[in-house]
Every structure is written in C-alpha cells, then in structure tokens.
C-alpha cells in the first residue's frame, strides 16, 4: 500500500538548511498519531529526467501529520511542492 505526499520544505532554521532532510505532508494523514505509523517507510521522488531518489521517514514533524524524511542525496529545489510516494 502506498501513500502520496507533498514535499513542503527542507528542514531548516534561521541560518541553516539541511538539503537531505525534507518535510513531507502525507495526503489523508491529519494527526501526529497517524503520522507516527509511517516512521521507517521508504519515500520515492521521481525527477523530471526519470531518476528516482530514495529516502526514509525518520520522525514526525509537528502535530498536523507532517513527517521528516532523510534522503541519500539532497533533493533539488524543483522537488518543493512536488509529489512523493510513500511505500
């Protein structure tokens, strides 16, 4: 069973940005409890050229169901707002 999600942002602070950690909002997940069940699952993003970048959900972000995913390589800026597949 796979779930679609939207890439919201990089994990960042006022002065630093972590390019290989993304904040993702899974569709139809609206609480921290539902999001915590996704920890450890694989995240796939397909680039416009067809390359597939893999990541893993490492923790929940906030209380509205967003999660943090750590990728092998950092995602490019064109991934922001794009869909990912959570397997």
Swiss-Prot record:
Q: Which Pfam families match?
A: Ribosomal_L35Ae
GO cellular component terms, alphabetically, are: ribonucleoprotein complex; ribosome
Keyword Ribonucleoprotein recorded: yes
Q: What InterPro entries does its record include? A: Ribosomal_eL33, Ribosomal_eL33_CS, Ribosomal_eL33_sf, Transl_B-barrel_sf
SUPFAM superfamilies reported in the protein's UniProt record: Translation proteins
User: One GO BP annotation here?
Assistant: translation
Entry-linked PROSITE patterns: RIBOSOMAL_L35AE
The text of the family note is: Belongs to the eukaryotic ribosomal protein eL33 family.
Q: Which NCBIfam families match?
A: PRK04337.1
Per its record, how is this protein called by name?
Large ribosomal subunit protein eL33
Question: What phylogenetic lineage does the species belong to?
Answer: Archaea, Methanobacteriati, Methanobacteriota, Thermococci, Thermococcales
Q: Which gene encodes it?
A: rpl35ae
């Amino acid at each position: 069973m796979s779930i679609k999600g939207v890439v919201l942002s990089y994990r960042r602070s006022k002065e630093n940005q972590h390019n290989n950690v993304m904040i993702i909002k899974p569709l139809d997940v609206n609480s921290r409890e539902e999001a915590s069940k996704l920890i450890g699952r694989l995240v796939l993003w397909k680039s416009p050229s067809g390359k597939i970048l893999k990541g893993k959900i490492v923790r929940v972000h906030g209380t509205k169901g967003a999660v943090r995913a750590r990728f092998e390589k950092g995602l490019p800026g064109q991934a922001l707002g794009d869909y990912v597949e959570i397997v």
